[in-house]
Design a protein with these regions (language model features):
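Active-site activation/catalytic loop segments of kinase-like enzymes and analogous catalytic loops
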Residues: 143-173
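Short glycine/proline-enriched turns and hinge-like loops at secondary-structure junctions
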Residues: 122-124, 141-144
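Activation of the activation-loop gatekeeper triad in protein kinase-fold domains
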Residues: 132-137
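ATP-dependent phospho-/nucleotidyl transfer catalytic cores
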Residues: 10-34, 41-111, 116, 120-130
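Short alpha-helix boundary/capping segments
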Residues: 19-27, 138-141, 166-169
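A general structural signal marking secondary-structure boundaries and capping sites
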Residues: 36-39, 43, 153, 157
Length: 173
C-alpha cells in the first residue's frame, strides 16, 4: 500500500528557521497557544502515541542511568558536574508523568515540536497563521509544548548545531 499526505498551500506565508525579532518568537507562542486552545475539548486519549515514551522522563532517566553505567564513549568523567546535577533531581523527574497518571493534570492534545519553523507567519504582518508539521501530535501535557517552545526560543543556535560552544541559553526573549 502507498499513502500520500497533502496539504493546502498557505498563500503569502513565511516560515522562519530562527526568530529575527522578539515578536517572531512571540508569534510562535500565539500560534501554539491557539492550537492548544482550539483543541482543549478534543478527547486527547483517542490519539495514538506517535513517539512512544517521548516525554516519559522516568523512562529517559532510566536510559541515562544505564548509559552512565556503560559509559560507551568514555566521556562521563568530563561532564561529572552536569551528571551530578541531573542525578540530584531524581525525586522531581516524574512530577509531570505522575500528575498526568493521577489525573491531577489534564490530558491534552500536544504538538511536541513547538519550534518557530512549525508556525506559518503572514508574510506582511508577521502574525501567526497556522501550526504545521502535525506528525508529532499526540496526547500529553500542555507543559510539554510550553517547555519545548522555551527550549527552542532560549537557544542561541540551531538545535542541530555541531559547535556546542555556540549553544547557550538566552534569557532576553
Amino acid at each position: 500500500d502507498a499513502y500520500w499526505r497533502t496539504y493546502d498551500f498557505v498563500e503569502d506565508s513565511i516560515c522562519l528557521q530562527l526568530p529575527e525579532t522578539d515578536e517572531d518568537f512571540y508569534q510562535s507562542a500565539v500560534g501554539f497557544g491557539t492550537f492548544q486552545q482550539l483543541l482543549t475539548d478534543f478527547p486527547a486519549a483517542k490519539l495514538h502515541e506517535t513517539i512512544p515514551n517521548f516525554h516519559n522522563t522516568p523512562d529517559r532517566y532510566r536510559a541515562l542511568l544505564e548509559t552512565l553505567e556503560r559509559d560507551p564513549m568514555h566521556r562521563a568523567a568530563q561532564v561529572q558536574p552536569e551528571i551530578e546535577f541531573a542525578l540530584a533531581r531524581q525525586a522531581e523527574m516524574a512530577t509531570i508523568q505522575n500528575a498526568l497518571t493521577a489525573g491531577e493534570l489534564p490530558l491534552r492534545v500536544t504538538h511536541n515540536d513547538t519550534k518557530l519553523n512549525n508556525v506559518l507567519l503572514d508574510a506582511k504582518t508577521r502574525k501567526a497563521l497556522c501550526v504545521i508539521d502535525l506528525d508529532t501530535v499526540m496526547p500529553g501535557s500542555s507543559l510539554y509544548d510550553f517547555g519545548d517552545s522555551i527550549r527552542f526560543g532560549a537557544a542561541t543556535a540551531a538545535e542541530d548545531e555541531k559547535d556546542i560552544f555556540k549553544m547557550e541559553m538566552s534569557l532576553d526573549r
